[in-house]
Amino acid sequence: MKFPQTGLSHLVSKSLIQIRGPDALRFLNGLLTTRLLPTITKKKQHTISSSDNSAIHATLQDVVDVSTNYGLMHEDIYDPEHNILIGRDGLNSMILNSKGRVVTDLYLYAMPFSTYLPESETCTDNDSLWGKTLESEMSQPNFLMEVDSSRVKSVILMLKMYKLASKVKILPRDDLKSYYYYNDSAEFDDFLDKLQGEYFTSTVPRAALDSANRFIKENAVFQSKKFATGFVGFGVDYRIPNFGIKFVSNKQITASGTEAGSGDQVTIENVFSDTFKQQFQVQMVPEDAIIDRRFSNGLFETGDVAADESSLLPFECNLDYINGLSLDKGCYVGQELTIRTYNNGIIRKRIYPVQFFKLTDNAKEQIKQEREKEPVLESIFLENVIPTTPSSSKLTLSPLQDVPGDLQNKAQEQTNEQTQKSSSPFETSSKPVRKRKSSSGKVMSSRGDWGLALLTISDVTKSPYFKVDMPSSSSSSSSSSSSSSSSSFYNDGGNKVEVGVKAIVPEWWPIEE
């Protein structure tokens, strides 16, 4: 999978929802997996982690006024010092249902990011209007929630259902646009480390706002005079360390060489500061590049699957790995199963990045000898052998049972279709019972020769190689087959093809002890 090394993209697949009002903090804190309030509510032992951070909680209560637009709380469950920072930059989170299943992932912005207005000899009506807007938006808790556009209506409906008597306003913001910039270079990684150390290490709200204003004024990333007006939200994407930067604006950014047609448009040259452009290339790229890059790094989003096909648990979506979970916030919808699972340490499945390849006899032989030599596998685009990609629930993954093993014994592949005698403590029965076919997981989504698959962790530990199965009713091989599934597909030439899968453990995953 190829994509540009750097680029800026308008995330057209994302929609924004504004949640503001006196009760907005408490309202969202009861829904999100991340923490927004300085206080905790410990009703049962398993509602928060067993660590004692009472001193930190007491300090937060002294500095955070929940009736104000203080910003957001940032914490990392893998931080041994349990630091909690206050910032105007955004954070990653999820909303669960009452059974602890994922409703949607989201990115939450404090709105507005800053109150800085660039100094100008000629103050325009637009500048004056923006100044009044900032004053109004800072008067009470105010947030922007970014969700996948395919789920925005259901999320708004759910928010309004939970609202009850809370004093909050829930508004779709179709006038605002989400943007994403990335640069896969060591220099940019170092730049983001310095950026966060310089502007996003505050522990009190006043200092957080001052740092955000200084971030804009000093042109750390963006041009303050040409782009500050209309700059709404900002955050470093730390789902993967220093993965990119996200920001929200009311302006449409256009490519180089194009003319801005109105005051609501700005060219990419006028977005980033001169200092930033001297260090890093800036160019517009399609959103497909952002998605391809995310897939190749194994970063799953709930928008990758249809809402009616998903009943995922947060740990299956690697929520604990992508900085989207607080262990000390107390009660929220779906928290009991989540925290109990974390405390028990029993997580059976996770979503892995996978690569598809042609499962030929030669590939099987190479996999068998993997310890001696790295297999050279021929990649395959899943959509080339499945003209219309079926729903994820139809594409299951099973272990390569003949690897390692006797490759010449092809009959061994049919063991799951054989019958066995049923046993009873009361009588002997000759009634045949079909042996249940083992499944290690399923393909959640695919793009070219890459995909994201939900797999049993223990199976991946044994071997990262699997084969793709599809129910015979959806397979083009035969609709009258007695088997429950088929591992054969057909390419454009009508030839039968078997598809293999190699699961990859991302380098950015924490090392499990």
UniProtKB/Swiss-Prot annotation:
Cellular localization per UniProt: Mitochondrion matrix
Positions with biased composition (Low complexity): 391-400, 472-488
Transit peptide: 1-44
Membrane-crossing residue ranges in chain numbering: none
Molecular function GO labels: transferase activity
Positions in coiled-coil regions: none
Annotated stretches, region: Disordered: 391-445, 465-494
Main location: mitochondrion
Keywords carried by this UniProt record: Mitochondrion, Transit peptide
Biased composition (Polar residues): 409-428
Gene Ontology biological process terms, A to Z: iron-sulfur cluster assembly
One Gene Ontology cellular component annotation held by this UniProt entry: mitochondrial matrix
InterPro entries: TrmE/GcvT_dom1, YgfZ/GcvT, YgfZ/GcvT_CS
Domain of life: Eukaryota
Gene3D superfamilies referenced in this protein's UniProt entry, alphabetically: 2.40.30.160, Probable tRNA modification gtpase trme, domain 1
Cross-referenced SUPFAM superfamilies: Folate-binding domain
Record family assignment: Belongs to the GcvT family. CAF17/IBA57 subfamily.
NCBIfam families: ygfZ_signature
Record protein name field: Iron-sulfur cluster assembly factor IBA57 homolog, mitochondrial
Classification of source organism: Eukaryota, Fungi, Dikarya, Ascomycota, Saccharomycotina
Gene: CAF17
